[in-house]
């Protein structure tokens, strides 16, 4: 009788069964989710029979612009600036310094363009588009007939030493690019418009946008071409780009199968009057990943033609017309990248990481705020209700 009173088994067993059910449920749910994850991982996003990007070849060379030193920017010891030259095609700069110390770069007679690589990227990623532009202008007579006012393009490229711009260094890169724009434009005194084309890949597109907003009073930038750039400011810790000037044209090229920068973040929250975007994977009918967007053969053909087409035009309206004509032309023979069923589900899940990260940061921020308010309330209550004295 005593043991029954001390240990009420009738109350303990139901609770034990309840806990076991919860444990079993969690284990089964984990197994199901893991099995589903393994199964989805084994499913290819695109069919192996799907047409792929054409491989490209070039003969790159890079001339470092040492004249862009500490007298022009305090980041000269941290970053570098190069001029791309396609071997046996482009005119090589004179290695002998002139009286200005610009190593012969003042003899350049083309249209300047500045390439800005992305997070942990390389300045050499400019080579694919730059090489094709040189071939089109110097060796392909079709484009000279199609664009009689075209000029050759001098591609400059910024080297951030593979810096993680998605997490740090973005502000330094913006200041460096802003100063580089002014330096490059001064190399072209014969250019009456003093304009430069900015090309940014991934986070480099954000650097270009912010730098262009700082250059607004000088009007050195009138068009920006971005490749797989998250324009909607998905990362709260980075500088915002909402102050983008309306006088600058913005072309956003992205891929619907990009896992790093999904289509949901490629459109800026506040569009300018001259904004244009296109899904390159859908337009060309080939899967293009985040890195492939700078070298994919089919895409670089259109990008290079567009750049050659706008090189001899002076007004922003005319330049935007060229881009829209090339990227919104006849699509009868082209089609979307075929992704259906579970492959599409896998793609959406993999692309949702940006939104999950934003929600996590949002939840952490408000958790810290609520905890701080609770602690302040406790302190306030403690000081306004002192303990009674005896």
From Swiss-Prot:
One of its GO biological process terms is: fungal-type cell wall biogenesis
Residues in the active site?
A: 202
> Can you tell which superkingdom this protein's organism belongs to?
Eukaryota
Q: Which Pfam families match?
A: PGAP1
Q: Does the keyword Transport apply?
A: yes
One GO cellular component term:
endoplasmic reticulum membrane
- Could you tell me what this protein is called? GPI inositol-deacylase
Gene that produces this protein = BST1
């Amino acid at each position: 009788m005593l043991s029954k009173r001390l240990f009420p088994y009738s109350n303990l067993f139901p609770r034990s069964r309840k806990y076991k059910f919860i444990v079993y449920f969690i284990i089964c749910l984990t197994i199901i989710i893991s099995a589903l994850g393994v199964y989805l991982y084994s499913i290819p996003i695109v069919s192996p029979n799907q047409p792929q990007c054409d491989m490209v070849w070039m003969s790159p060379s890079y001339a470092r612009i040492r004249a862009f030193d500490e007298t022009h920017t305090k980041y000269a010891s941290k970053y570098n600036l190069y001029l791309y030259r396609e071997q046996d095609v482009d005119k090589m700069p004179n290695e002998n310094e002139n009286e200005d110390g610009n190593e012969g770069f003042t003899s350049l007679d083309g249209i300047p363009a500045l390439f800005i690589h992305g997070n942990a990227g390389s300045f050499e990623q400019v080579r694919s588009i730059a090489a094709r532009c040189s071939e089109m202008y110097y060796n392909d007579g079709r484009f000279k007939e199609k664009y009689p006012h075209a000029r050759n393009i001098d591609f400059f490229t910024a080297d951030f030493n593979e810096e993680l711009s998605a997490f740090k260094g973005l502000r330094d890169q913006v200041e460096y690019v802003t100063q580089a724009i002014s330096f490059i434009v001064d190399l072209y005194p014969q250019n009456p418009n003093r304009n430069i084309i900015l090309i940014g890949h991934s986070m480099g597109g954000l650097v270009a946008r912010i730098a262009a907003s700082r250059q607004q009073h000088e009007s050195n930038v009138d068009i920006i071409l971005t490749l797989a750039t998250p324009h909607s400011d998905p990362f709260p810790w980075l500088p915002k780009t909402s102050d983008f000037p309306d006088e600058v044209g913005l072309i956003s090229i992205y891929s619907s199968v990009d896992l790093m920068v999904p289509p949901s973040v490629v459109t800026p929250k506040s569009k300018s009057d001259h904004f244009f975007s296109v899904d390159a994977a859908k337009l060309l009918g080939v899967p293009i990943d985040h890195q492939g967007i700078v070298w994919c053969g089919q895409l670089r053909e259109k990008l290079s033609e567009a750049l050659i087409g706008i090189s001899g035009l002076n007004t922003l309206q005319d330049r935007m017309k060229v881009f829209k004509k090339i990227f919104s032309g006849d699509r009868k023979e082209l089609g979307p990248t075929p992704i259906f069923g579970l492959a599409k589900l896998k793609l959406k899940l993999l692309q949702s990481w940006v939104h999950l990260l934003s929600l996590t940061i949002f939840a952490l921020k408000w958790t810290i705020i609520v905890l701080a308010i609770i602690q302040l309330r406790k302190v306030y209550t403690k000081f306004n209700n002192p303990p009674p004295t005896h």
